[in-house]
């Protein structure tokens, strides 16, 4: 018997209903901010996908050669594709360009709870504005999306420019900066201490204290003032702190200021944030930030940008008590008669035209078996139709939960009860 590939999933109808409903609620938030939906190819050139992706993700790419021997890869996330899309389609469009997307991505992960080789991302990118209000708009949209689905979460917000200012003050190489940022992202404290000690010995500097002062300060907005006092000689770090202060003035939500956020992708340049779902033991469900150099890296004009992506599957794990109401209607003809079947089809068509999902018994079951079928599918509303009901113009609607039965006027199906 064939089995699904490792790290992939099949979704049952009840799971898909839940996924589609959550997707719809998140889309509604994006639409309310007037972001426009786009889509990109599932695969792109390997050169594009690997150009500015974190080393760990680069090693997890699904790579193949097409029939023209061109090296391709399945997208591991959307931002690189969206940057390419922007350069191809929108570079001359009035700014800002506000886009959102939803689709599947692929990484050769070690499958475990909340981590799959095929997974879904939903996110947004705002390109063309370097103003603090743009960062705030993206932050607010990410937060309000999760609030719309009643998810319990915590958002941590930081700024890469704070540590960048420390690195520049001590003249660290780009390679050292990248290594330190990756160790921070992996929360490898011992590895970070060793690397910083090695740098101190090679350069005869004392950098460890400042780095850990930045990393260990967490809390509310007051953390920014405290860190300013510790970084008075670090001009670029102070600029970053002032920028973050301005952004947070425009974010009317609860958050934790955390400068230990480094993000696993190499293209972030300014404000960064991560959102953790509380149900799954603080698993990250969303991440994003500012990336002002990425468009230029892909041979476009320098364009400031900010965005984020939801890990859609992890969101699902965090709200498994999310109730999906089944509002479908099941029509049971009491006998397999052409006249009766035609009338059932007419009634079903009218109900569907008014937005109701309707199923007709297609198996010619006896009434008890048809009702058992409705119960097995958790259908709450059943219409049982005989010839007398058609002639009288009133059809019986049975509530499968309460057993209550009422007569509905065939001419008034627009006001069919929920």
Curated annotation (Swiss-Prot):
Localization per record: Cytoplasm
One Pfam family it belongs to: tRNA-synt_His
Superkingdom of this protein's organism: Archaea
Catalytic activity, reaction form: tRNA(His) + L-histidine + ATP = L-histidyl-tRNA(His) + AMP + diphosphate + H(+)
Gene Ontology terms describing biological process: histidyl-tRNA aminoacylation; L-histidine biosynthetic process
Top class in the EC scheme: ligase
UniProt KW keywords: Aminoacyl-tRNA synthetase, ATP-binding, Cytoplasm, Ligase, Nucleotide-binding, Protein biosynthesis
Chief location of this protein within or outside the cell: cytoplasm
EC number(s) stated in the UniProt entry for this protein: 6.1.1.21
Signal sequence range: none
PROSITE patterns named in the record: AA_TRNA_LIGASE_II
Entry GO terms, CC: cytoplasm
GO MF terms held by the record: ATP binding; histidine-tRNA ligase activity
Family as reported in the entry's similarity comment: Belongs to the class-II aminoacyl-tRNA synthetase family.
Name this polypeptide is given: Histidine--tRNA ligase
Organism: Methanococcus vannielii (strain ATCC 35089 / DSM 1224 / JCM 13029 / OCM 148 / SB)
């Amino acid at each position: 018997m064939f089995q699904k590939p490792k790290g992939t999933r099949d979704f049952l109808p009840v799971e898909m209903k839940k996924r589609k409903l959550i997707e719809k609620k998140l889309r509604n938030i994006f639409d309310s901010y007037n972001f426009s939906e786009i889509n990109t190819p599932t695969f792109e050139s390997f050169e594009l996908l690997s150009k500015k992706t974190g080393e760990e993700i680069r090693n997890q790419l699904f790579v193949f050669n097409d029939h023209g021997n061109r090296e391709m890869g399945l997208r591991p996330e959307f931002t690189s594709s969206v940057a390419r899309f922007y350069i191809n389609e929108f570079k001359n469009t009035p700014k800002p360009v506000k886009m959102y997307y939803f689709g599947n991505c692929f990484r050769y992960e070690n499958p475990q709870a909340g981590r799959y080789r095929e997974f879904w991302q939903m996110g947004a990118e705002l390109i063309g504005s370097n103003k603090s209000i743009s960062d705030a708009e993206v932050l607010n949209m990410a937060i309000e999306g999760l609030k719309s689905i009643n998810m319990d979460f915590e958002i941590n917000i930081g700024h890469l420019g704070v540590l960048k200012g420390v690195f520049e003050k001590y003249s660290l190489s780009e390679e050292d900066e990248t290594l330190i940022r990756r160790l921070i992202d992996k929360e490898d404290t011992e590895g970070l201490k060793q690397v910083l000690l090695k740098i101190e010995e090679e350069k005869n500097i004392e950098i460890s204290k400042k780095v850990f002062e930045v990393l260990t300060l967490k809390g509310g907005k007051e953390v920014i003032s405290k860190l300013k006092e510790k970084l008075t000689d670090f001009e670029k770090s102070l600029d970053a702190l002032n920028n973050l202060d301005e952004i947070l003035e425009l974010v009317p939500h609860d958050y934790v200021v955390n400068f230990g956020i480094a993000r696993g992708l190499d293209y972030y340049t300014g404000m960064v944030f991560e959102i953790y779902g509380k149900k799954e033991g603080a698993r990250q469900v969303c991440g994003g930030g500012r990336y002002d150099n990425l468009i230029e890296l892909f041979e476009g004009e320098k364009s400031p940008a900010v965005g984020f992506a939801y890990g859609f599957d992890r969101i699902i794990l965090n709200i498994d008590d999310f109730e999906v109401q089944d509002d479908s209607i099941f029509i049971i003809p009491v006998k397999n008669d052409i006249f009766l079947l035609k009338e059932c089809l007419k009634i079903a068509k009218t109900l569907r035209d008014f937005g109701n999902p309707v199923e007709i018994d297609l198996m010619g079951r006896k009434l008890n078996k048809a009702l058992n079928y409705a119960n097995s599918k958790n259908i709450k509303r059943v219409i049982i139709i005989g010839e007398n009901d058609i002639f009288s113009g009133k059809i019986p609607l049975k509530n499968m939960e309460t057993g209550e039965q009422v007569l509905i006027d065939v001419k008034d199906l627009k006001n069919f009860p929920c």
